Swiss-Prot record:
The active site is at residue 8. Belongs to the peptidase T1B family. HslV subfamily. Allosterically activated by HslU binding. HAMAP family: HslV. This is ATP-dependent protease subunit HslV.
Length: 181
């Protein structure tokens, strides 16, 4: 299954004891019409202890947020276990398998990319990005972590997404930023 992620960028970073995630607000119908400018694609879950962001179909993402939050509750906030269980259910369920979205989930200790093909990937460097502007944000974020160590995780996240928005036509500058201290 090939996933084409359009109309969004989600970026997450763990840096100097902080965890930050941000997403842009653009929702695009097809490749030509911007339907919404201020969508909120990053959320806090589990009493503010977990951040989650999605790229892909909005309806599919709401389904996945709900399923993921249920898994978090079932496993008492264990992010790793909830992520693995969601990926397994997503991959094996005939209806869920058709959902076209990807998630980044994180707490203070871990972050994962979770997909419908069963992947649960924890990055080596504490940085993840998904969506149409993901590669641009990832590149900018890695450079900032390496060479601007005076920046906070929140500043890195916002700056990386701003760079992506300058390059990717499916990413705008209406940024939602959430931070775990």
């Amino acid at each position: 299954m090939t996933m084409e992620m359009h109309a969004t960028t989600i970026f997450a970073v763990q840096h100097q004891g902080q965890s930050a995630m941000c997403g842009d607000g653009q929702v695009t119908l097809g490749n030509s019409v911007v339907m919404k400018h201020k969508a909120k694609k990053v959320r806090t879950l589990y009493n503010g202890k977990v951040l989650a962001g999605f790229a892909g179909s909005v309806a599919d993402a709401f389904t996945l947020f709900e399923k993921f939050e249920t898994k978090l509750q079932s496993f008492n906030g264990n992010l790793t276990r909830a992520s693995v269980e969601l990926a397994q259910e997503w991959r094996s369920d005939k209806v869920l398998r058709k959902l076209e979205a990807m998630l980044i989930v994180m707490n203070k200790e871990h972050m994962y990319l979770v997909s419908g093909t069963g992947e649960v990937i924890e990055p080596d460097d504490g940085i993840l990005a998904i969506g149409s502007g993901g590669n641009y944000a990832l590149s900018a974020g890695r450079a900032l972590v390496r060479y601007a160590d005076n920046m906070s995780a929140a500043d890195i996240a916002r700056s990386a997404l701003e760079v992506a928005g300058e390059i990717c036509v499916f990413t705008n500058d209406q940024i939602t930023l959430e931070v775990l201290e």
